[in-house]
């Protein structure tokens, strides 16, 4: 089984993950824009038991999403890098920030969610997997 590693900007927090993500996307919601300081967040979701924080401590911030649901955001206490997401709607799964992996050339075939909130200057290739808002329950059946 593939193992991948990553960490925060200052190196205090390190993680290891087993396997491939079950879900991956670029989220263009306003909260992800503000959280990352960028146009979107790259989110890779794994079963929570496949993710191990190997060093460092995380601080948690709970926020409301554009959908109205809550999400726990875990970040480095020292440098503030966002590393892990825990959306209430995805029980048993955790999201890892794509930019925090040591190697990123394996990340591909992203779809886009919350496209209705994307910046006007950002072009997104039309794809039926892209969502104007977030996922619906039908996407998980």
Residue ranges and their predicted role:
Residues 1-141:
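A short Gly-Trp-Pro
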